């Protein structure tokens, strides 16, 4: 089984990024605005001349929505709106959290909203925060690729939940084919990395899985080792 992705409408050549959510691509010989849902920098993916796959978008400033980037050796999903659906599929297929089921999406806890609330086989509940990883350097998948104060706050909330006796998880979806290991990006965002490591010390369970993209779907490619420090 694989996770089906929406069929893109057109391939294009990326030209430049305007801001966090907008870029410009050349589509069939003309420049067009593209909505970018992933807030990361994506500098190693979205550079002038890179091949991108777009979906047509109804309404809003941009007529296109960025789905994926095509590199010489791989396709990389860059639509972060898909992450919760992918994580739900992984649970339902038994690839992660075997025996658990999805009780709720986007549950609230404390001052934060998380991605999934799972029900354990014994009826208990588990909070899960899902993060997508598109940065890979020398076989190491790194998160984040841009500083994320919100991400650090999520880790602190999960640590509090674990300290109060709740089961809590962080699941990293690694979307790079060559990745062999996951690590927080200490060089770029030490605050997030430290918050993640402290969350693990508090009892939050950290895991990473690799997903390989093809036209047009994702296949589960196994768990990756995690190195926090």
Swiss-Prot record:
It comes from Pyrobaculum calidifontis (strain DSM 21063 / JCM 11548 / VA1). One of its GO terms (molecular function) is DNA binding. This is Sugar fermentation stimulation protein homolog. CDD domains: SfsA-like_bacterial. InterPro entries: SfsA, SfsA_C, SfsA_N. Belongs to the SfsA family. It holds the Pfam family SfsA.
